[in-house]
Amino acid sequence: MIENQNYIKKDFTTTKLAQQYDCCTFTDCNFENAKIGNTTFMECKFVNCNLSNTQLNVTSFKDVNFNTCKLMGVNFNDCNTFLLQFNFNNCDLTLASFYQLTIKNTSFISCNLTEVDFYH
């Protein structure tokens, strides 16, 4: 488990991620097209990061905030649904999918939600 770390301008596109991040902040990081599997993010913040087309196979997001991030084409329906909780502020979620997910406590503030799939 990695705790209380700040990552700035790090490229995670080819980096193998740890299994769990707790109270970490990712700023100006690139995850575009990365394969993030079986990773847990607890109380983390993503600020101005590119996560477009990232594959989230069984990834857990527990109380995670995304601020000014690109998340285009991300299939959140591949996430681990146990305690799933995240919020989005000023993010681009064009073509993202939350298909069959229960996201009642999720907020989308000033986000681009063009063609996002919220079908339940």
PLM regions: where:
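Tandem repeat scaffolds
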Residues: 1-120
